[in-house]
Regions:
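Pre-Walker A adenine-sensing motif
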Residues: 1
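Hydrophobic anchor at the beta1->P-loop junction of P-loop NTPases
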Residues: 4
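The conserved Walker
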Residues: 8
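Conserved lysine of the Walker
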Residues: 12
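Hydrophobic positions on the alpha1 helix immediately C-terminal to the Walker A/P-loop
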Residues: 15
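AAA+/P-loop NTPase substrate/partner-engagement loops
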Residues: 22-65
Length: 215
């Protein structure tokens, strides 16, 4: 799960589509049939038919139930959605969420579930910030973070009298890069693609071939 966060108009949707297309291309180079599904905010999975890359662009927290959000984000199991979506089986390889809210703020608004259950299922987050003085193509700053488990839980204030206890948080791994193409390449090559296409998926043994190893 990749979460892209930034203010309206900063280019979240464009970046989500660019990243999804590059993942699709890499899948096809690995002989994996790949396709992209962009979900609508009203009925996100009505037109979903097994695409392996899913873009959830500007969905609201209540676009899915808490249980359906968790099913979609589950990295280990195929997810049968609720009857609202006719029990569709959702089996994406990659989910790209684009939203103006931070993940912590977004998931805190989903009722009936601990926010940590959502945050720990996010692998990476890209945050986009507009420069105060933009210059041609280098008008944004891009950061990549990954989710880490905290050794000591921390409290996050989300309103005047409400706190969240966080067991997971985001750690920056690529900081303040204003070269979009360079940033995308590094993020994909070093962090996103290795998760999307684990080595065993494309190994000869995974394709039914045996390998004789000598030690």
């Amino acid at each position: 799960v990749l979460y892209i966060q930034g203010t309206p108009g900063v280019g979240k949707t464009t970046l989500a589509n660019e990243v999804a297309l590059k993942i699709k291309t890499q899948g096809e180079l690995r002989n994996n049939k790949s396709d992209i599904y962009s979900a609508s905010s009203r009925n996100p999975f009505d037109d979903y038919y097994g695409q392996d890359i899913v873009i959830l662009d500007d969905l609201r927290p209540d676009s899915l139930s808490a249980s359906d959000w968790l099913k979609v984000f589950d990295p280990l199991n195929s997810a049968n959605m609720s009857a609202r979506y006719k029990n569709k089986l959702v089996v994406p390889r990659v989910i790209v969420v684009a939203n103006y809210q931070s993940p912590l703020k977004f998931f805190s608004e989903i009722k009936g579930e601990d926010v940590n259950q959502f945050v720990r299922r996010v692998n990476s987050m890209i945050s986009i910030e507009s420069k105060q003085f933009p210059h041609f193509d280098f008008d944004n700053i891009y950061n990549l973070s990954e989710v880490v488990k905290l050794s000591t839980p921390r409290n996050l204030r989300i309103s005047q009298d409400e706190f969240l206890t966080l067991n997971f948080d985001f750690k920056t791994i690529i900081d303040k890069n204003d070269d979009k193409e360079k940033f995308i390449k590094q993020a994909l090559d070093e962090y996103i693609l290795p998760r999307a296409f684990p080595p065993e998926i494309n190994s000869p043994s995974a394709n039914g071939l045996s390998i004789n190893k000598t030690t």
